[in-house]
């Protein structure tokens, strides 16, 4: 849910322009609030026809929603063109929706861009809760993300962190005074892990029939991750006015379908290459191999599930770890506290995943980062398919629902000084075990994130090793660079840091 962006043919511009002009005339007479049903959530005043779209034009809806929550409360209604949307901004109400009222609100409501990019919900994360969802979630947990499967990939995760540290050491040795770009190093190794898990091999290049040439690993990453994340936030104004769906929006369609076609061509090439290795007896156990053996999926479903596995670690895990290292570099006292905890528990031994349960402050750093920098600020919209109640309010069938995790985690009634990054709020026994997951970064209930265990392993082990090995300091002037971009809370300004070897051995 982004800004109202008219586009496409002149007819579209004229039609929408007329609506906006009418709305502007109405605005002169006073802002008009949506008609309120008895016992309905509070409604944010908007304009005729377009509702509240003009108030979301900054493309940071999670922040706007949080500001409205301070005025209208944790649950309220807005209008986005023809649609009525209930926005939830508190942990209590969000959990009621995701757990207690799950049966009434389990259907995903995707934008036109996401519908195209996910091939109409052909993924674990975006599918409706149905037999298909249960089946494919079982597949990914059994073969890649569950407890047993994670043990299988332990050596690869350890090697990933080792490779990153080796690169950091080399960069520091080559130029001790130059800041390094954290994301460049972390991104490459995460993508390597994703490819090995998904495809059985760290693919350096692949021949794509549609392109008529080999493409590099960087091009593979751009086609399957970067371009897709940017395209996912493309706005089709017809989503808000379905009765105008007949009007062309050529600029949107060209961008989205070109990106999707390119992704499909690259994924087909990667899958074809792995199938050829299987025939030659050279393939290693991986997610694709598991899915092929199950023999229950169409070619399209197979491609989408492998693509989902490819981007799962390569995006949100990067986002969380980069923000954690940003905050530790910005707050040297908290970085020192974490380092001393690691020293007390590990001594001169290298910190490993086995040490993680004995590092409570590291755990606090992780959860506070998830709270302050929610990897996915807005949970993808859901569709209320039967009349229900939320927080005592009546919510009719046909309503869309958005959970604003950013708003939940910045709610002053639930968190003290929420704008500050304070790991201590999760440390020292101040919260019960269940409260550690109050941030809802991994969702809740039957739609909880399948990749939560792997994300925790990677982020916590990486942060611990990075702090054990180096002292971290921000590049001068970067202390307040907290803007985000893309569908996830991707840091707009990549983290630039100065590293100092600790010389622990």
From Swiss-Prot:
Keywords: Heme, Iron, Membrane, Metal-binding, Monooxygenase, NADP, Oxidoreductase, Transmembrane, Transmembrane helix. The chain crosses the membrane at residues 3-23. Heme binds at residue 449. Its EC number is 1.14.14.86. GO terms for cellular component: chloroplast outer membrane. It catalyses: ent-kaur-16-ene + 3 reduced [NADPH--hemoprotein reductase] + 3 O2 = ent-kaur-16-en-19-oate + 3 oxidized [NADPH--hemoprotein reductase] + 4 H2O + 4 H(+). InterPro entries: Cyt_P450, Cyt_P450_CS, Cyt_P450_E_grp-I, Cyt_P450_sf, KO_chloroplastic. The keyword Protein biosynthesis does not apply. It is a single-pass membrane protein. One of its GO terms (molecular function) is oxidoreductase activity, acting on paired donors, with incorporation or reduction of molecular oxygen, NAD(P)H as one donor, and incorporation of one atom of oxygen. It comes from the Eukaryota. The keyword Heme applies. Its cofactor is heme. One of its GO terms (biological process) is ent-kaurene oxidation to kaurenoic acid. Its main location: membrane. This is Ent-kaurene oxidase 2. It comes from Oryza sativa subsp. japonica (Rice). The lineage of its organism: Eukaryota, Viridiplantae, Streptophyta, Embryophyta, Tracheophyta. The gene is CYP701A6.
């Amino acid at each position: 849910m982004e800004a109202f962006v008219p586009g496409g043919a002149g007819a579209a511009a004229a039609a929408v322009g007329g609506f906006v002009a009418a709305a502007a005339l109405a605005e002169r007479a006073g802002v008009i609030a949506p008609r309120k049903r008895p016992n309905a959530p509070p409604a944010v005043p908007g304009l005729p026809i377009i509702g509240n779209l003009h108030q979301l034009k900054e493309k940071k809806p999670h922040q706007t929603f949080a500001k409205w929550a301070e005025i209208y409360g944790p649950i309220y209604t807005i209008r986005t063109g023809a649609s009525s949307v209930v926005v939830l901004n508190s942990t209590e109400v969000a959990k009621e929706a995701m757990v207690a009222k799950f049966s009434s609100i389990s259907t995903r409501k995707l934008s036109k861009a996401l519908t195209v990019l996910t091939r109409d919900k052909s993924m674990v994360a975006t599918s409706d809760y149905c037999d298909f969802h249960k089946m494919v979630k079982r597949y990914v947990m059994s073969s890649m993300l569950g407890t047993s499967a994670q043990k299988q990939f332990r050596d690869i995760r350890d090697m990933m962190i080792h490779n990153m540290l080796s690169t950091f050491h080399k960069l520091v040795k080559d130029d001790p005074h130059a800041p390094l770009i954290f994301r460049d190093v972390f991104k490459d190794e995460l993508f390597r892990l994703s490819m090995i898990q998904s495809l059985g091999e760290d693919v350096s290049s692949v021949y794509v029939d549609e392109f008529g040439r080999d493409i590099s690993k960087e091009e593979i990453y751009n086609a399957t991750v970067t371009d897709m994340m940017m395209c996912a936030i493309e706005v089709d104004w017809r989503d808000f006015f379905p009765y105008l769906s007949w009007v062309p929006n050529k600029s949107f369609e060209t961008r989205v379908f070109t990106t999707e076609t390119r992704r499909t061509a690259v994924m087909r090439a990667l899958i074809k290459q792995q199938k050829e290795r299987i025939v030659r007896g050279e393939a290693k156990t991986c997610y694709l191999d598991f899915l092929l053996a199950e023999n229950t999926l169409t070619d399209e479903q197979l491609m989408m599930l492998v693509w989902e596995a490819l981007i799962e670690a390569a995006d949100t895990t990067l986002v969380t770890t980069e923000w954690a290292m940003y905050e530790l570099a910005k707050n040297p006292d908290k970085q020192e506290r974490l380092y001393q905890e690691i020293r007390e528990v590990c001594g001169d031994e290298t910190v490993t995943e086995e040490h993680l349960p004995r590092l409570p402050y590291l755990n606090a750093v992780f959860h506070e980062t998830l709270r302050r920098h929610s990897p996915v600020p807005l949970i993808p919209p859901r569709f209320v398919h039967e009349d229900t109640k939320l927080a005592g309010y009546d919510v009719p069938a046909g309503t869309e629902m958005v959970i604003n995790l950013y708003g939940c985690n910045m709610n002053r009634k639930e968190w003290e000084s929420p704008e500050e990054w304070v790991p201590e709020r999760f440390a020292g026994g101040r919260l019960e075990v269940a409260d550690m997951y109050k941030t809802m970064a991994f969702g809740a209930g039957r739609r909880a994130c399948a990749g939560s265990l792997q994300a925790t392993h990677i982020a916590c082990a990486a942060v611990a090793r990075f702090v054990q090995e180096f002292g971290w300091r921000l590049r001068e002037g970067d202390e307040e660079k907290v803007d985000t971009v893309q569908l996830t809370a991707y840091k707009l300004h990549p983290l630039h840091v100065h590293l100092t070897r600790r010389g622990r051995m």
